[in-house]
Amino acid sequence: MLEFQRAKTVLLKLLVAFALLFGAVQGFRLLLLPALQTLFTADAALTSVIRRCGILACALFAYWAYVRGFEKRPVRELRPAPLAITAGALFGAASIALCMLVLFALGAYVATADRGWQGGLAGVAALILIAALLEEIAYRGLLFGILERAWGTLPAMWLQSLVFSAMHLANAEDRASTVELLTTAVSGVLLGALWTMVYVYTRNLWVVTAHHAAWNFTIILAGVPLSGLDDWRPLAPLASEYRGSHWLTGGVFGPEDALLTMALVAACVIAMMRAGAQSATIENGVSVIFPRGRWVENAGENPRGPASPRIAL
């Protein structure tokens, strides 16, 4: 009965949180932006900037409103942390760059032309950053956060990662075989777990957004598919082709589906999980090791509830 009541509470919170997020973003796109366009004359480029910045601002406001209004707590995960954000971006870019360098060295990826820096890349970078932040707000901030406070860090991580993976399968489902889609599903779960662990270790949405965006933009710069999307490849400094089987190159989904990348991501996730299990002493439902805490286990509806034992994997 208790678990059923908890599940109902989780479902209600998710409905409220995502209704706020969706409503804020759509309200800006369908109501506020057209009103601004009526009042002020702007060219296509300026309108695009206003649209992206407005969507971002509304999403952040919706998240802030949910946390302050429904969770009744400070929004610590949106506090600025310049050094940690920089480190997150460097870690994200370096991780996927290492995998792609190996794939280029093995001949799985071949650069066919050097186009140099393209004028549209700055706009792509901004779009990637906004998309990464929206995903982090939705998946790590809301979905993972609500699940974690109900059932603990590790169950929440895997549940959220399954949803994250499922939502990305559509990117390449019409161009991939069943085996390739299964590989993509596993890759998506691992990436969801990786970004969850980055968030768990930092408790900062800006840091995990920087990691996520830098990871994605590095893939774009190499001229290979990004999560099954080819839209930005013509703007990449490198024109690249993938040659070889799907397990080696990632095929139409890109380097995230390559076995090498999946192995690296899995190793990072396992290392962070083990480090957390060995070092995180749980006190009042929240770790005392890092600021704001790392792990929550069986915290129920009160993240500052009774002390819990050390996490056991």
Language-model features, listed with the residues they occupy:
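Hydrophobic core of alpha-helical transmembrane segments in multi-pass integral membrane proteins
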Residues: 17-27, 56-65, 93-101, 261-276
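C-terminal TM-helix exit segments that contain a strictly Trp-centered aromatic cap at the helix terminus
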Residues: 24-30, 98-104, 218-226
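Alpha-helical multi-pass transmembrane bundles of energy-transducing inner-membrane proteins
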Residues: 7-8, 204
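Select subsegments of transmembrane alpha-helices in polytopic membrane proteins
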Residues: 20, 86-95, 160, 257
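Membrane-helix interface linkers and caps
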Residues: 1-6, 28-90, 102-119, 143, ...
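Mid-bilayer segments of alpha-helical transmembrane spans in multi-pass integral membrane proteins
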Residues: 89-102, 128-129, 133
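C-terminal ends of transmembrane alpha-helices
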Residues: 100-110, 164-173
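Transmembrane helix-loop-helix hairpins at the membrane interface
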Residues: 2, 13-14, 18, 121-305, ...
